[in-house]
Amino acid sequence: MSPSAPEQKPQLQQQQQQQQQGSSSGDSSSGSVNDSKSVTPAPSATSSTSQSSTAPSTSSDDNLICRWNACNQKFPAPEALYEHICERHVGRKSTNNLNLTCQWNSCRTTTVKRDHITSHIRVHVPLKPHKCEFCGKSFKRPQDLKKHVKTHADDSVLVRPSQDPQGGLNYRPQPPKGPSSYYDHTGQMRTNAAAFAHQAGHPSGGYYAPQPSTNYGLYFNQPPINNARTEHLGYSAAAGGYDRKRTYDMVDDFFGSAKRRQIDPSSYAQIGRSLMPLHGNLSVPNGPMTATEQYMPQPAPAPVHAGPTPSQNPLAQQYYLPMPSARTQKDLIHIDTILGQMQDTIYENANHATAGVHIHHAENGFNGYRNTPSPPTSHRSPTGMHVGADGYQPVSAASMASPMTAISSTGTPAVTPPSSSMSYTSGHSPSPSSSAMSPQSRHGSTASVMYPTLPTSLPAVSQGFGHSATTTLGPSFDGSERRRYSGGMLQRARAGPLPLPHEDTSGASTPKASESALSVGSPSSESDVSDATREREEQYDRWLENMRVIETLREYVRGRLERKEFVEDNESPQSSHSDAMDVDPKSPQAPPRELGTPREGSSLYPILRMPGA
């Protein structure tokens, strides 16, 4: 631009002369004018550039002038201006000159604290002491820098993923191994980028919810955490300690009520009411249960087996969890005996609780209480109500099944004979071309499918749950279907009284004897579920929860007995005998008496020693 400045005046004169010429020379003059314009800037352009070069210095000087009321004092640096406003105009409460109203020009912003107004003053003062380590951009307030750094954290996730070979799903974040994962735009690593590792979106931070551990038999549920958390999960024990302590107290109260015989072990109603507060609070893992609840303070064991990602046991607290009702070995044995009686009572009420409810098996659940090598099968109740994966109780038998689903010793289903099983395709029509569950591939005879055979002699119910009854016969191949066929007619059970047998209009012959035994209902939509059926489902769910809680508590007590996690009774022999809580008034047989202990009845009354005796 500077070499063309001396030629500016002659070119302007030439331009004026060319504009005064005739039309014959107009084209050539316009070309020369265009050439002069293209290489030589206008006078206004040169003046504007010179003004723009001096504008920053002038504007910076104006920004360093105090505009608080009529102060107009000029400062050499933004730091000096900011300190002047805070000390001179805002003041302090200790010097009795605190001013909480901003008087910069016409701002008039009023705050309630001195820290607030000093932070507000940064808006007016060109002071930007907070500099970004990634891009070098400066900010006036620390919260502005904090928001800006989050954008760099998101960029680092997209550009440079985590170098952690474990996938970043650790429960506790590991210390940094070498350089951090934050990089600037030139690929250079920042040394202090680890200070922002907790901001958001970093995959190697490790702030994720723990997976359920399979190493503990009794632990309490924690709310699922599906998003990244900004705080360290190592401090979550204080937040969730209230719920764990509350559940722990409920278990202790239940043990105390059972020891004091406030719960009748032979009454299913009392057992159900006492176990109701524990429903949903105790968890049974899907793996082997070893009942390693940390009763005494010790660090959580580090598992080395292969399987799901282990995590810290919620019960593995680093402090002593007292349970007064289950402290000694005698207490644990007594509680285990009472729990066994309650479990037998719940078993005895299985027929009443599971009447009319189909026992649904999960894919990875237990297929019965008996550990036999027989194949898992699904069964149907007399009314044929099926509780499917999208029904009322999705996982009603995921971890524990009813005794009705037990497998007999011969390897066949105890409830349903194999000959009465049916299969059908996705079109809800019986077809010999069913692939996986075809009756032809399992039985080899169509007659055995169309005409189920009944056993010649049925055992009594008192022989156990492994035997079948007449009213419990039904198809067994109903893994994912919602309806069944009986006699070639689309039918479904309903909760009303047993209707009259319907005649088959499809032309297929129907065995009338099996029709009466299978309690056939009229066709209806799947949404037509009566209140009685829904009530039976809820009753079955309560029975199933009672079974789960009792089994969990028994394994917890047995685990403590096996590991000898109880307080040793080192007291005198007089205090080691059974007290009033351990006496069962309903038991006809007295507890065994040990040698050297007082006779029966002495524990009920104090022994007064006479002087000199």
From Swiss-Prot:
Keywords: Activator, Cytoplasm, DNA-binding, Metal-binding, Nucleus, Repeat, Repressor, Transcription, Transcription regulation, Zinc, Zinc-finger
One Pfam family hit: zf-C2H2
Subunit structure of this chain's protein: Binds to DNA.
Name of the protein described by the UniProt record: pH-response transcription factor pacC/RIM101
Motif YPX[LI] motif 1 mapped to chain: 451-454
Motif annotated as YPX[LI] motif 2, chain positions: 605-608
Low complexity bias spans: 11-60, 417-441
GO molecular function: DNA binding; zinc ion binding
Chain segments carrying region Disordered: 1-61, 146-186, 371-391, 406-535, 565-613
GO cellular component: cytoplasm; nucleus
Keyword Transcription: yes
GO annotation, biological process: positive regulation of transcription by RNA polymerase II
Start and end residues, zinc fingers (C2H2-type): 64-89, 100-124, 130-152
Segments of skewed composition (Polar residues): 442-460, 506-517
